[in-house]
Every structure is written in C-alpha cells, then in structure tokens.
Swiss-Prot record:
Belongs to the conotoxin T superfamily. This is Conotoxin LeDr243. GO terms for cellular component: extracellular region. The keyword Nucleus does not apply. It comes from the Eukaryota. It comes from Conus litteratus. Expressed by the venom duct.
Length: 63
C-alpha cells in the first residue's frame, strides 16, 4: 500500500508529458518515409539497368 501513492504520482506525470515532438523542425528535418521512398526509387532504377546485377555491378559504378 505504500507504493500506491508513488505509482499514482508517476502515472500522472507520465500522462501529462507532451505527446508531440518538442523540438522545432528545421529545413534539414526529413520524415523517414521520404528516405524509404528514395531507397525504393534507387533500387527500382538499378534493377532496370541490364548490366546491374548482384554479381556484376562494375558497369553501374558501384563496384
């Protein structure tokens, strides 16, 4: 029973924290989804090139 008031206080403190990011966004901030989209786009471009393969990527400038 001694822990109950401490637990209630901690619960109230956790519930009162802001649910949004407190840091202001800068122009360099980029959502993670755009990084994933860029990676998918690059992989699609590389898979379209006939010379790019897992074993021989010398003509793509990767190896």
């Amino acid at each position: 029973m001694r822990c109950l008031p401490v637990f209630v206080i901690l619960l109230l403190l956790i519930a009162s924290t802001p649910s949004i990011d407190a840091r202001p966004k800068t122009k360099d901030d980029m959502p993670l989804a755009s990084f994933n989209d860029n990676a998918k786009r690059i992989l699609q471009i590389l898979s379209r090139k006939p010379c790019c393969s897992i074993h021989d990527n010398s003509c793509c400038g990767l190896g």
